[in-house]
Structures are given as C-alpha cells and as structure tokens.
C-alpha cells in the first residue's frame, strides 16, 4: 500500500510538472501574439505554433561552405529541354526582383517583412524549357543536402533564387552566396547554398523529408512532420 501511495504521488508530481511546462509554453505563444496586437501587427500573419522574432536564428546541418571568387555556380537540369549552368555574375545579370515577405522556420520562429533580391525561379525554368511531364523540383545544395518542392510552388511570383537579403549580399551563415526562397512553405524548403535545381516527374523525398519531415510543409497547416 505504501508503494502504491508513493507511486501515485510520483505520478501526480510528474503530471503537475508537465502541466506547468505546457502552461508556460502556451503562455509564451499567447504573450507573443498579444505583443503583435499591441504593435498593431496582424496576428493572422503568424502561423499556429509559431512565435515572432526580430532576430534571424541560424540553424543548419554541417559546415558553412566558403567559395573563392568565381567558384560558385548554379545548374538547371532534369526534365528540361536545354540544361544550363550559370556563374554568380551571370545570375546577377538576369532581370531581378526585390520582394518583401514573412518567413517561417519549422523550429517555430517566424520573421516578418524580410526583403530579398534575386531571380524568379520560373524565369530560369523558362530559359531551360520545362518538359510537360514535370511535377516537382529537387533543390540540391552543398554537402549533399536536398529538399523537394512541387513545381507549382517554386514557380510562383514570390519564389526566387536569392543573392541579397535586406539590400546586402546574403551572409554565408544565412545561405550565401545564393539560396532559394519559397516563402509560403516552412523555410527548410528554401535551401541554403543551393547549387542546382533538378526538375522531376514525381515527388521524391529530400534530406529532411527522409528523416521525418513533411513532404510539403505548409506552416499554416503545421505540416512539420510525417503524418501532420
């Protein structure tokens, strides 16, 4: 009877601890949304389970690559009529856009009103001639990192191959010299240090997708992991 009583006390103690932690976590997100409203910001811009930060957290796997001048290039290939490779100077010589949008990381932070400059992915694909059977794109980055995106999502007005952030070259820690930006999906779908875009006729899991992350990654549906 004593053992049972002790077990009940221990169990109830664990339950209280979990409850308190959950309450603190919920309160943090609630406070963050209240702060948005106090600043006159539209809280509906913040996906569920996210918090707003003014910082730009750095999260990645592996080392940060470095490039000698002229070393970086981007290849466009797969199911296209005319594959090609661009140097950084050639990429920057193409018609560019400067766009401002919110970004959302799967690790729960969001950052509003980020400004990026680059070339629309759809313009690069127009140069290559995407074959009619194409449905998806694999982003290939340094060190073998990959992530998959539907063709329709990476060819919107907002999806770009970016080389500037807030008016300056993208810092290496944030994916420079060039990264993808697909702002309406969780930000792991916007590969840092991108080196090639491969057009596919099917959906193929990339690095994180093979390791439990969602194949699509809509932040407003909280599609973080398999089954979400």
What is the role of each PLM region?
Residues 21-228:
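Structured, non-membrane catalytic/scaffold regions adjacent to prosthetic-group chemistry
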């Amino acid at each position: 009877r004593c053992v049972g009583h002790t077990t009940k006390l221990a169990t109830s103690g664990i339950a209280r601890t979990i409850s308190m932690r959950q309450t603190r976590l919920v309160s943090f997100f609630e406070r963050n949304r209240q702060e948005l409203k106090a600043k006159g910001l539209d809280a509906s811009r913040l996906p569920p389970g996210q918090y707003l930060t003014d910082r730009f957290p750095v999260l990645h796997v592996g080392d940060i690559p470095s490039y000698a001048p002229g070393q970086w290039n981007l290849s466009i290939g797969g199911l296209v009529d005319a594959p090609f490779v661009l140097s950084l100077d050639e990429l920057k010589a193409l018609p560019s856009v400067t766009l401002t949008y919110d970004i959302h990381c799967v690790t729960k932070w969001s950052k509003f009103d980020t400004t990026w400059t680059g070339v629309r992915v759809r313009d690069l694909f127009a140069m290559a001639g995407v074959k009619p059977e194409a449905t998806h794109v694999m982003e290939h980055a340094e060190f073998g990192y990959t992530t998959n995106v539907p063709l329709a999502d990476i060819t919107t007005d907002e999806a770009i191959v970016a080389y500037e952030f807030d008016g300056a070259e993208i810092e290496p820690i944030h994916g420079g010299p060039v990264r993808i930006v697909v702002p309406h999906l969780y930000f792991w779908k916007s590969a840092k240090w991108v080196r090639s875009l491969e057009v596919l006729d099917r959906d193929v899991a990339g690095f994180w997708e093979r390791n439990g992350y969602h194949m699509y990654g809509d932040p407003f549906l909280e599609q973080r992991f398999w089954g979400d």
